[in-house]
Amino acid sequence: MNDKYRWLRVAAVLVVVWLGCLAMTHAVAVIAREGEKAPVTSQQAALIATAVFPAINAKNVCLDTPLRITFASGPIVGDGEIQVLDASNDIVVETINVSVRIRSKSIGGLPNFNYYPIIINDHVASIYLSHALAYNTTYYVKIEAGAFKDRSGNPFTGFTNAEAWRFKTKAAPPVAGAKELVVAADGTGDFASVQGAIDFVPPGNKTPTTIFIRQGTYNEIIFFTGKDNLTILGEDRQKTIIAYANNDRFNNNAGGNPFAPGAPLPGTVPARSGAVYRRGLFLAHRVTNLTIANLTLHNTTPQGGSQAEALILNGTPRARAIITNVDLYSFQDTLQINGQAFVQNCYIEGDVDFMWGTGPSFFENCELKALRNGAYFTQIRNPISNHGYVFKNCTFEGAPGITGNFLSRIAPARFPASEVVLIDCLLTDAVGAVGWRLDQVNQPASEAPNVHYWEYNSHDSAGRPVDMSQRLVIARHLKLPDDGKSIANYGDPKFVLGDDWTPLLAPIITTQPASVSVSIGQKVILSASVAAVPAPKYQWQKSGRNITGAAQSVYAIGSVDSRDAGSYRVVISNIAGKVTSRVAKLTVVSARRRTGIPRLP
């Protein structure tokens, strides 16, 4: 090869090497701005960010939004600071040192809640600020290099200037006294967190207010007090999820034990008195007329992680709380109710004393699942002045292989009154033959007169009576006709809950019937879901006229013909009120005729 071509070949190699080095030095990760694309440079070996939320230059951002970064690979927390600054004056409004894994903040006006400022799920790092931002303000985010790394230790190069990640918050809050507030994790609602919406409601609220939570997972601890007349309503029971790993080790109650000897009932003390548990996922303290419906509360504390309620209601004997169509997940102490509450159509699982408190509480049509052998479904500590926990038409079951559980336990020397009554309940093998437990196993009823462990018509899945022959000595088997009055009384929520209260919730439609287009001969199912107490009646209509026999939540047409086309809706009612669904249009499409000359074989 002559020298001229040798030089050209060397030059070409140098160009390729230079381009490769340039690519390594300036590998680009594209992060979407609102309405445009903007490159963010980082080294090829570095952890690459592919998206941020709120988007760059986003507007109308919720004040309570978490910040989220999506990476090309799974991140871990490194070292460094994250800052949020006011773009108008470059003042830092929040600084997070990522090496400090746990911080403290006020929630719902109560100080000293521990929380995780950064939560990583798969490729997404969510950053939680200690307080809400301000309305009508532009902010930018700075992140030091190395604050996040990939699992090989390669750093995220961060954001270092005011233009890299900036956004503007909503211009103004919702109208004062608004009767509905919308929470949406994607930022399309009035608030991005459930707590943010609750905080907006004024103390002593007298206006019935619905906080509607769209589908999504909300990683937050909820606490509020003095916020009355609230309905917390999820868009979808399984897909609207409030979750957090809060527990007694993470948020220990430094103010004392609410159940210490001589302590007042938990729902009677002010929140700032100190004797209020901070360990639950969702805590409502001293509120009245609270309804929680159509969502999931999941305390993600692992088994053995100490007491970890999914829901704590610290009310009074006049709290008038309604919990309906709610799934509750945890292990130890899943549900604690101190005060008046009606619980309907709920799923509750846990392993030790996973339903407990002072009551009075009435459970109807609930599924209760034990996750451990030989443990306890309940531990009820009601005062003599009110009833405890009553279960009607509920199922006591266990996870696969779980057996030998007690329906309840108590130590009468410490808590002399404990009332747990089962009416028409289904008991599986998860419940042991003894059924109940006292600290002193053979203690006679005469020595614990205020312990009421009573059952009527406990049966298995085939409807056969449960064998009561081995029940604890103190337990009582109610029978007809002798115990007819007691059976009737304990089957009535008004009797159990007291204060002359009959739980009522006018129907709230949670899933509307959907329009559909089908061909002749196909099957059609129209349906609607509601939260309501008592259970509602349904009447489907076509073109505004009642359809005979269409009186269920689902209306089915087995084989559609052209005459079925039209507008359908359902009227749903109970003694508390009536609601009419949106119109669902049924379009019937005729099979198309083939045209043209058929092909000959």
Where are these regions (language model features)?
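A short beta-strand segment in extracellular, disulfide-stabilized domains
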Residues: 68, 522-530
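Acidic, low-complexity Ser/Thr/Gly/Pro-rich repeat segments typical of extracellular/periplasmic
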Residues: 41-174
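Sequence-level preference for short, compositionally simple segments enriched
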Residues: 172-505
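Conserved Ig-like domain signature around the intradomain disulfide
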Residues: 536, 565-569
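Solvent-exposed loop segments of extracellular immunoglobulin-like
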Residues: 531-539
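Surface-exposed, flexible coil segments in extracellular/virion-facing regions
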Residues: 541-558
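Surface-exposed, proline-enriched loop/turn segments that connect beta strands in immunoglobulin-like
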Residues: 54-56, 511-515
